[in-house]
Amino acid sequence: MTEHPREDLAYAIGVQAYIWGYPVVINERRSRIGMASSTDIIPHMLRGPLNTFVSAKELLTPDFEDVQSPNNDTLYTTAWLDLRDEPMVMHVPDMAGRYYTYQFLDAYTNNFTYVSQRTRGFQEMNIAICGPGHSGALPSGLERIDAPTPTVFIIGRLGVDGPDDVPAVHALQDEMFLGPLSGWADRRLAEPRVAEPSGHTGPLAFFEEGLEALRTLPASEARAALEVLGRYLKERLADRGPILLIHHMVHRDNEGSVRRHEALVS
């Protein structure tokens, strides 16, 4: 029998919450890096404002450290989307037989769809990416993709057949378009928006960022299971004051010793 059952339980829950919340928090942090601190587009770093395509103009080398093991035979195009206000529309030009793929990741970093030569062929197309709960009609000629979360990360890759082929890929990148549904008729771009600092510091910043992100996300099966656990704990500990959701957070200092931090969540 442990001497501190409540503390040990809270610690165990904290560890599980950290593991489960890791992709959400890291994705949020990565989005802040990906969205530049100004409205400028920085192609060689694949950074730019929200709801904007940013295209690399040179093949990446090992010096590029924002992504592990980047391709050297494709040019990248990326975008961070916020679909809470309205859908975003992307235009894919006729690829004329060239390899391409657009990878769509939700806020949990799950790949929920691909737009590629395998799934769509090479023809020109226009696609509306809709957030959860959007039920409005779309203009004629728009294919609909429903995103499971209100934030989405797109990673596009266009095949390049050596350095001499780069200008041809630049031309395709210039034909790509991304903008709000409300501006689709006149191809209006989104108003430039940059990432806001998280505002969370200190040893509990990870958990605070995770809770903030989860407030905007629809429930997944894993999250639903955690909510059931949370209700159970609240019932069991209701007569003992605030719930010790994370009583002990463990991290090691430079000497390798363990320090504990208490957080009370009512």
Regions found by a protein language model. Give the residues of each.
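A compositional/structural signature for long, glycine/proline-rich flexible linkers
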Residues: 1-266
